[in-house]
Amino acid sequence: MNIEVEMKVLDERMADFIPAYATEGSAGLDLRACLDEEVVLQPGETFLVPTGLAIYLANPAYTAVLLPRSGLGHKHGIVLGNLVGLIDSDYQGELKVSLWNRGSEPFTVKPFERIAQMVIVPVVQAGFKRVEEFVGSSRGEGGFGSTGSH
């Protein structure tokens, strides 16, 4: 399934870094840091990184999800400060990525470095029906760890 997403280039330096799928099977599009200079993230610090891009999905049947790049998280402890970013279909502002250094060493974010990935996903908007009781299920109210171990 393909959809067309409107995109504005807010910083002309990013015109050479339009998000694109790396392979035919790629789910995520890389987002890059639109920085004037390097930023050093100390352990435990967060920094809101601009991308120089804005998107408008327009259709409430879709959202964009921002996720960490696996290599940054595994090798350097760099993840998203909010763990997952959610871009609503009616948002039109600049895409920004909250980076969090959960590692033990300082990490340098370089201008135009790939910092996160964006995945466009379908959304189901649910309506809620108030009930007094649920129809029984085999799980019932079993919560964390209730379905067994490893």
From Swiss-Prot:
Substrate binds at R69, S70, G71, N82, L86, I87, D88, K96. It is an enzyme of class 3 (hydrolase). Its cofactor is Mg(2+). It holds the Pfam family dUTPase. Pathway: Pyrimidine metabolism; dUMP biosynthesis; dUMP from dCTP (dUTP route): step 2/2. SUPFAM superfamilies: dUTPase-like. GO terms for molecular function: dUTP diphosphatase activity; magnesium ion binding. Gene3D superfamilies: 2.70.40.10. GO terms for biological process: dUMP biosynthetic process; dUTP catabolic process. InterPro entries: dUTPase, dUTPase-like, dUTPase-like_sf, dUTPase_trimeric. It comes from the Bacteria. Its EC number is 3.6.1.23. Keywords: Hydrolase, Magnesium, Metal-binding, Nucleotide metabolism. It catalyses: dUTP + H2O = dUMP + diphosphate + H(+). Belongs to the dUTPase family. This enzyme is involved in nucleotide metabolism: it produces dUMP, the immediate precursor of thymidine nucleotides and it decreases the intracellular concentration of dUTP so that uracil cannot be incorporated into DNA. This is Deoxyuridine 5'-triphosphate nucleotidohydrolase. It comes from Neisseria gonorrhoeae (strain NCCP11945). The gene is dut.
